[in-house]
């Protein structure tokens, strides 16, 4: 199991710091495919049929004041499926994948939901 800040996510954040155009990532999706998240990933493993959800974005404190960007979103299943990965995107469709995580499958029935909390923590280590 892994959770990664993707190479595209890193590049977009640096571009924003340099004055480039930037859309804050706040859209969450989930997938049903197998695999281990990698920094080079640009998509989920088999993105599921539900639409991406716009999450609530906030700035939080993990170690030092305001060092964490956080998005919280809840997705509801449209049918029976097992969710194995999730990601944070900068668009409701298409767009760039910033954060991706894979995990042990969570079996869902129609109308079941999962609340995801995705954090990007600035760390000098």
Stretches found by the model and what they are:
Residues 1-84, 91-125:
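Small cysteine-rich, disulfide-bonded extracellular modules of the LU/uPAR three-finger superfamily
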């Amino acid at each position: 199991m892994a959770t990664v800040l993707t190479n595209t996510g890193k590049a977009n954040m640096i571009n924003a710091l340099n004055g480039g155009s930037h859309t804050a990532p706040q859209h969450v999706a989930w997938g049903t495919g197998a695999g281990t998240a990698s920094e080079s990933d640009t998509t989920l493993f088999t993105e599921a049929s539900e639409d991406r959800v716009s999450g609530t974005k906030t700035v939080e404190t993990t170690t030092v004041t305001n060092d964490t960007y956080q998005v919280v979103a809840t997705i509801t299943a449209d049918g029976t499926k097992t969710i194995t990965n999730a990601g944070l995107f900068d668009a409701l469709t298409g767009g760039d994948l910033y954060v991706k995580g894979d995990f042990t499958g969570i079996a869902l029935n129609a109308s079941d939901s999962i609340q995801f909390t995705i954090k990007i923590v600035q760390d000098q280590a």
